[in-house]
A protein has these predicted regions:
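C-terminal amphipathic alpha-helical interaction region
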Residues: 168-169, 201, 248, 252-253
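Flexible glycine-/small-residue-rich
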Residues: 112, 218-220, 250
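A short, charged
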Residues: 74-81, 239-254
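Helical "lid/coupling" subdomains associated with nucleotide-phosphate turnover
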Residues: 4-189, 195-198, 209-212, 216, ...
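Low-complexity, glycine/alanine/valine/leucine- and proline-rich hydrophobic stretches
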Residues: 194-246
Length: 254
């Protein structure tokens, strides 16, 4: 077998590393891919420029990684599931208004998954602790800018949303990402308020957009006075961000 000179000097160091891995993990077998770093760079370039379409669902990998982070910090699984359903219903029903796409939908899902992880550190500073956890944790598949957007949406879920100069001073966030953060925050606030008690009282939520009015009709057999009251508190910011009216009521009532 003929080995190129530029690769020959790498053989011994690689063998040492591989041997150590085998000994540390007591591996019985070792699988080595037949690709190099350059292959990965070429593939990434081709996919981003739409020269080829990936058959692997990388977004699912990102969501799995985010769920593992939420699990590590003991986030409420049922609360997250309920809040995610509501957030995605609102997102999908307002596509014509907000202009966001598939990638932004993914960022919203991750924000919901991680919005409560700060409780593991402090019950009084949940939003700030969640922000710091997200910014300190690498999530494979997300850029630093995307993590900043997610972390900021989580931070302003319960904090007053500042002006661009104020947020930019701390995060160096672009205007485009500032607007994206505002949109995700507005949706996250509404979705989180729908399960503020963490009891999953809302059986179903009918979201309809008509003539720039978003109707939220809550279906529940339980008392949802707390949730509807909190929705009114989040209404003003949502209307300001999206430029539409928000009408909320319980099913069967006018």
């Amino acid at each position: 077998m003929c080995i190129r000179d530029r690769y020959a000097s790498l053989i011994v160091p690689n063998m040492v590393i591989i041997r150590n891995f085998i000994e540390i993990f007591q591996a019985e077998a070792l699988w080595i891919p037949g690709v190099s770093l350059l292959d990965g760079i070429a593939y990434d370039y081709a996919e981003k420029n739409k020269y080829l379409k990936s058959v692997h669902n990388f977004e699912n990998d990102i969501l799995v990684a985010s769920r593992n982070i939420a699990k590590r910090y003991s986030s409420g699984k049922n609360h997250i599931a309920g809040t995610t359903d509501v957030a995605l219903d609102i997102f999908d029903s307002t596509r014509k208004i907000h202009g966001m796409g598939k990638r932004e939908r993914l960022l919203l899902q991750i924000a919901v998954l991680l919005h409560d992880c700060g409780k593991y550190i402090s019950m009084s500073e949940v939003a700030e602790c969640s922000y710091r956890i997200i910014m300190a944790t690498e999530i494979i598949g997300l850029s630093t800018e995307e993590r900043q957007v997610i972390a900021s949406a989580v931070r302003y879920n319960t904090r007053e949303f500042g002006c661009y100069k104020e947020i930019n001073r701390e995060t160096s966030m672009s205007r485009e990402n500032y607007l994206l953060t505002a949109k995700l925050t507005a949706i996250l606030r509404l979705a989180n308020a729908m399960d503020r008690s963490h009891y999953q009282k809302v059986k179903a939520l009918n979201v309809t957009l008509k003539d720039r009015i978003l109707y939220l009709v809550v279906d529940s057999a339980r008392d949802v006075s707390l949730e509807l009251g909190l929705l009114k508190d989040k209404k003003e910011f949502f209307e300001e961000v999206f430029g539409i009216r928000l009408v909320m009521r319980r099913k069967g009532r006018r």
